[in-house]
Amino acid sequence: MLMITSFTNPRVAQAFVDYMATQGVVLTLQQHTQTDVWLADESQAERVNAELARFLENPGDPRYLAASWTNGHMDSGLHYQRFPFFATVRERAGPFTLLLMAACILVFIIMNVVGDQRVMIALAWPYGPAVQYDVWRYFTHALMHFSVLHILFNLLWWWYLGGAVEKRLGSGKLIVITIISALLSGYVQHKFSGPWFGGLSGVVYALMGYAWLRGERDPESGIYMQRGLITFALLWLIAGWFDLFGMSIANGAHVTGLAVGLAMAFADTLNARKRT
């Protein structure tokens, strides 16, 4: 057996062990003056040390909390430090993630004050020749949401996935994904239903596709989406396509966003593999 590291805080040690278990690596803990982490299969040492370095950079990452939940240690007394809500939001998101969240919330408030129609006339996808050169319209449709559930669903996913991408890969990468997916998903949805649509879900589906495929093809990037979550997203997509919810859903934007995210992840991982 090989000792990987020692933690002064047993809660942190357990979080790392739980996460590695979800990656197929079995670690054991031994409690002395500190909590030692031991690896039985020494051939996995390089991989474990690489994961440890990422863990130490941000032990509060949602993936580690999710791993503890998966492994049943949420009620063992090994809980993460509790942070105020807004501090937690800021900690796990970069500036662009927060800026777009604030913009969506502001637009939602304005829509509820002055009415949807006035805001849509100003921000919707170009609806006629007179406004086709209003460049912002090709992107601002993503800022509009039409119910509390709509905006909560999109912003939670945006914070969870967009924040991870921005923290790991930088603001530039998140901005590029957002711009391309908003533009292309909006274009396709416009062809499906006309210009009167809105929501960040096309971008969210792009992030889902990007995070999942990036994690599958380039685990070292630290970007990933659990297979259970991507399965849920696909089932939601299928249910929306067949109108199982009885709601107006931008299916064209969802499918296009997912395709954009997958394509961008494939391109990025192809370049990464060439460099190695």
UniProtKB/Swiss-Prot annotation:
Active-site positions, per UniProt? 201, 254
A Gene Ontology MF term for this entry? Answer: serine-type endopeptidase activity
List, in alphabetical order, the GO biological process terms annotated in this UniProt record. proteolysis
Q: Where in the cell is it found?
A: Cell inner membrane
Q: Which reaction does it catalyse?
A: Cleaves type-1 transmembrane domains using a catalytic dyad composed of serine and histidine that are contributed by different transmembrane domains
What is the protein's major site of localization? membrane
Descriptive protein name: Rhomboid protease GlpG
User: Which superkingdom, per the lineage?
Assistant: Bacteria
What parts of the sequence cross the membrane?
Answer: 94-114, 142-162, 169-189, 192-212, 229-249, 250-270
The UniProt entry lists membrane topology as: Multi-pass membrane protein
> Which GO CC annotations does the UniProt entry carry?
plasma membrane
Family assignment? Belongs to the peptidase S54 family.
| EC number(s) stated in the UniProt entry for this protein | 3.4.21.105
Q: What does this protein do?
A: Rhomboid-type serine protease that catalyzes intramembrane proteolysis.
Provide this UniProt record's keywords sorted from A to Z: Cell inner membrane, Cell membrane, Hydrolase, Membrane, Protease, Serine protease, Transmembrane, Transmembrane helix
